Design a protein with these regions (language model features):
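Catalytic-domain carbohydrate-binding cleft regions of carbohydrate-active enzymes
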Residues: 1-384, 416, 420, 457, ...
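Catalytic and substrate-binding regions of extracellular carbohydrate-active enzymes
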Residues: 319-323, 331-584
């Protein structure tokens, strides 16, 4: 029986990498025209895979909106294969909700055109999350295809297997053992073609569980290969024992489903034996990583719960604005972008997207809070302070917040007129125009006071508690008091002379020494991988004298540690073990 080689035309589209999104868009417009022309004018050219992401279509249609119907027709014919993702997401750095939304909005985009590819197609993501089968099954997707992170050390030497999550969810996997580009620019020259195929075909055969293998015909930003039929004819001449034909990824899964004798694997895929998984990217460009984590948290833990509370009270749930925010950050969730293995100019663009997203998030959070507070009953007509608890359980915790008022002194009461015990930890004068331009627009130029206060109270689950602020003659403002250690129900913390901490855990009855010992060392790697300098003398803060202060009030403790460390100023100084600059 002849072995079947499925040649799958596709392109892998990095929206940005060492080039910007706008640079790639120029290529995209040309590539899309060639792809559609080929499909429309050659009905024996059956399929083309659009890299599993709809952001490509979004970028193209921003330039050529008049071509939407052309795309729609080809998608509905089953020839231009789109989705299911919005972008080619990373799985290890971004949050789980971001992965879900990437699929949700990608599928939503696909619905405007027709069917989407029901494969969790992530051919270049740097490792695979153990929860991916569970996520994919939630969208009725039962197939997965990827390249990076798998070897026989995971429990199988085959490139096809069932992948199971802890909850029992399962997907059928087709690994791309040599990546997504082994069929790029297939040559017409017989010697060149044989040289390449003689190297690749045995590897594909070895991992296969059926007589069907995949030869992906595409690469990064690669235009469609117009002479593919001539190349297929040449392949048939070179390898008469095989069948070569244009296909799509779903076709090989149909063949795999016929094979019941297939391994089952659990867990994540981060093995770099046969392909790089770039685990060092987890700590590159921490400004970008921290911005992403912060904004993801604001959306999922503040904005959307707050919007749900507002909706339950009769206000609009702004689906469109929230989708816009998610899509802004999901453009940054592509594996290269959030991996921060791009050029500096691209990293600037990534940070700008996060800036735009966070502006929308913060403003929408403020909008919802104001709508909820403004709608409160007239008996709450005094100045109000409202504490929200957006968790699904009651919380009795310390709240740190601000009161902005013209009052020189005030007291705080709940709706039952119980006086709230609070403490002012900081106050400052602020110009009225910095609060809201509408205040000074009406001639009110008097400054306001911003009081930072702490208090402890019980706030109901997925709800809020309102307080009234009443002006009084005077109030007690308790400042922090200086102390020599932190001591509470859980820990005793002391600051050592060099700025490290000695922590005694009362629950464990265990002492931890030299906490916050800092290590400074060099990295001679590239944008992907950390590479330590050979024979470098690492620098620690164990021999310095730090300036530290410990303060406390009734509600919290504060430790501040400052010191200066002498370190090399650049990689050459590090190679010479020469510390010639300072960091604070």
């Amino acid at each position: 029986m002849k072995k079947n080689v499925h040649i799958v035309p596709h392109m892998h589209w990095d929206r940005e990498w060492y080039f910007s999104t706008e640079e790639s868009r120029i290529l995209l417009v040309n590539n899309m025209e060639e792809i559609m022309d080929m499909l429309e004018n050659n009905h024996n050219y059956p399929y083309y895979v659009m890299d599993g992401q709809t952001a490509i279509l979004e970028d193209y249609l921003a330039v050529k909106p008049e071509c939407k119907e052309r795309i729609k027709k080809l998608v509905q014919e089953g020839r231009l294969i789109i989705g299911p993702w919005y972008t080619q997401t990373d799985e290890m750095v971004v949050g789980g909700e971001s992965i879900l939304r990437n699929l949700l909005y990608g599928i939503k985009d696909c619905d405007e055109f027709g069917e989407y590819m029901k494969i969790g197609y992530l051919p270049d993501s740097f490792g695979q999350s153990a929860q991916m089968p569970q996520i994919l099954n939630g969208f009725d997707i039962k197939y997965s295809m990827f390249w990076r992170g798998c070897s026989e050390r995971k429990g199988t030497n085959k490139t096809e297997f069932n992948w199971k999550s802890d909850d029992g969810s399962s997907v059928l996997v087709q690994i791309l053992p040599l990546g997504y580009a082994i069929g790029k620019y297939l040559p017409m020259n017989e010697d060149e073609l044989r040289t390449r195929m003689d190297k690749y075909l045995p590897v594909l055969d070895k991992g296969a569980t059926t007589d069907h293998i995949i030869l992906p015909n595409g690469h990064d930003q690669m235009p469609i290969q117009k002479n593919i039929f001539e190349v297929i004819y040449k392949l048939k001449e070179c390898y008469p024992e095989r069948k070569f034909f244009l296909s799509r990824y779903e076709n090989i899964f149909k063949e795999l489903e016929k094979n019941e004798d297939i391994d089952t694997i659990k867990g994540e895929f981060l093995d770099g034996k046969y392909m790089r998984v770039h685990r060092s990217i987890f700590s590159t460009r921490m400004d970008i990583k921290s911005a992403n984590a912060r904004i993801e948290s604001k959306i999922t833990n503040i904005l959307e719960p707050l919007a749900s509370i507002a909706y339950s009270l009769g206000f609009e749930y702004h689906y469109g604005l929230i989708e816009l925010i998610w899509k802004e950050i999901m453009k940054n969730h592509a594996h290269d972008s959030i991996g921060c293995c791009c050029s500096d100019k691209v990293h600037h663009e990534i940070m700008n997207r996060f800036f735009l997203a966070e502006e929308k998030v913060d403003q929408l959070i403020t909008f919802y809070k104001r709508r909820i507070v403004d709608a409160m009953s007239c008996e709450m007509a005094l100045d109000k302070l409202v504490a929200f608890n957006l968790m699904p359980y009651d919380r009795n915790e310390i709240v740190s917040t601000q009161v902005i008022t013209k009052m020189k002194a005030f007291e705080i009461f709940d709706k039952d007129n119980n006086k709230l015990d609070f403490e002012v930890v900081h106050k400052e004068v602020i110009d009225a125009g910095l609060i809201d331009r509408q205040i000074v627009h009406y001639g009110n130029y008097d400054s306001f006071m911003v009081y930072t206060i702490n208090f402890k109270d019980k706030i109901p689950a997925m709800g809020y508690k309102a307080y009234m602020i009443k002006e009084v003659e005077h109030m007690l403002e308790k400042a922090y008091e200086v102390c020599d250690m932190v001591d509470n129900d859980f820990y005793t913390i002391q600051v050592n002379e060099n700025g490290t901490l000695k922590i005694f855990d009362k629950k464990l009855n265990k002492t931890f020494e030299n906490v916050l010992l800092m290590e400074n060392g060099g990295d001679e790697g590239d944008e992907y991988d950390f590479s330590p300098l050979p024979n470098e003398k690492l620098i620690f803060n164990d021999n310095i004298v730090a300036n530290s202060t410990i303060k406390k009030n009734r509600f919290n403790n504060e430790i501040k540690i400052n010191y200066r460390l002498k370190v090399p100023k650049d990689i050459q100084a590090r190679k010479n073990n020469r510390a010639d600059s300072f960091i604070d």
